[in-house]
Amino acid sequence: MKISVVTPFYEGDRYMQDYVSCMEKNREMLAQAGHELEVILVNDSPWKTLKAPANGGQYFRVLTNSENRGIHYSRVSGLTEATGEYVMFLDQDDLLAEDGLLRLMQAALKNPSDIIIGNANLGQADGSNLVWYRTADHVKLIWDLQTYLNVGIQIISPGQCLIKKDAIPQFWKEHFVRVNGADDYYLWLLMMAAGKTHSFCGGSPVYNHRFTGDNISADTTATDDSVYDFLELLSECDYFKQEDIFRLHEMITYKAQFRKSNLFGKLTCTIANLDIFIANLKFKKVTKTGYGFNR
């Protein structure tokens, strides 16, 4: 079996050395088990030349956008060229465990599904790491549509996921999010709405989300803007329910209001969205995570 790792690069030279080292270690582990790795780098800063690393061997390929097109477009560009049965979208500044891809592949072969999700280390500003899924109850909610509509996205990054290439919805490949930050949220919603199946790769984290200070995913304003962008697109999707679009809009708007309001404002908007507030309190309790309310 072959895995294609697709990574958009935007002025990411400083990450290249660690990235290549990570891919080489994973390639070696896969090769020992009889699997292949293909790495596709998509240069989204075409004013700078991005070359395949000299020590990257023949499994590295570089595509260059004609202009800056954003993360979603770049991921789809790489996906179009991918030749693996499975694909991973890994960010330029994140890394995998040395056996991360192998363990995900083994999980895929043991329990075939459309997406295999592994645990993640979430880097903190103080240099520590937080393991993302810490309870069995949280694992049960990884692929639960209602949780995504009432609480928020439960996958830190597509870099912790192995996706069957032919399971990625055509709608996602044709309707692009223009604002960077939440095209993965958009992908998971479309896959769940289409009835795509998932499985969980247990054990230690396969993925390390590094805190760089530049992470878009840590900026709730940017990700909210991206969600509002894809909500407009979802209205054109014939299998995504309008009531679910409305619910997601309610949740994102409520949380944005809550974060920027004083105490009185928080109380006022919470009373107006009491069901969402209660859903988030329940989520925080069963998952034992402080990230429940603020996504």
Where are the predicted features?
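Conserved nucleotide-sugar donor-binding catalytic segment
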Residues: 141-220
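Flexible acidic/His/Gly-enriched loops in nucleotide-sugar-dependent glycosyltransferase catalytic domains
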Residues: 27, 57-59, 101-171, 221, ...
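Cell-envelope/extracellular polymer assembly enzymes that use nucleotide-activated donors
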Residues: 2-4, 38, 186
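A conserved acidic beta->alpha catalytic loop
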Residues: 22, 40-51
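Glycine-rich, basic loop-to-helix element that forms the pyrophosphate-binding segment
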Residues: 65-82
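Short, well-formed alpha-helical segments that are part of the catalytic scaffolds
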Residues: 12-29
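Catalytic core of nucleotide-sugar-dependent glycosyltransferases
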Residues: 196, 209-212, 218-244, 270
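Short aromatic/hydrophobic "clamp" motif used to bind/position activated sugar donors
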Residues: 87
